[in-house]
From Swiss-Prot:
Family under the similarity heading: Belongs to the UPF0178 family.
The protein's name in its UniProt record: UPF0178 protein YaiI
Organism this protein belongs to: Salmonella typhimurium (strain LT2 / SGSC1412 / ATCC 700720)
Source organism superkingdom: Bacteria
InterPro entries hit by this protein: UPF0178
Amino acid sequence: MTIWVDADACPNVIKEILYRAAERMQLPLILVANQALRVPPSRFIRTLRVAAGFDVADNEIVRQCEAGDLVITADIPLAAEVLEKGAAALNPRGERYSDATIRERLTMRDFMDTLRASGVQTGGPNTLSPRDRQHFAAELDKWWLESQRKK
């Protein structure tokens, strides 16, 4: 089991939660990005730098993740691809993607893209709140407990 992070867009506060969790759970945590990242010294935490470019980090995560892994991403198409491989996917707000919800999320994403392309101002996501951080940490722990039961 490995935790993969789509690190270019992952908020720093979520990375901090993941650093602590990797140590506590003694699980590999791999942050994939197209830029250099600073991470705390740990035998469990490493970075994987990829070339800059559209979806390069996403494609590398899809290529390397396996069933049973966890992928942290707000990228809905990436989440859909890793779910197909049998990995779990969690966004930085603590929402766990599932086979049951991913189609709806993809449809909504495509609809919002269409609105933006036609000139409609859709705004961005709200700032990550303390409640979002707590929800993320709770869902991360829930995933960990579920994965331990499956062993």
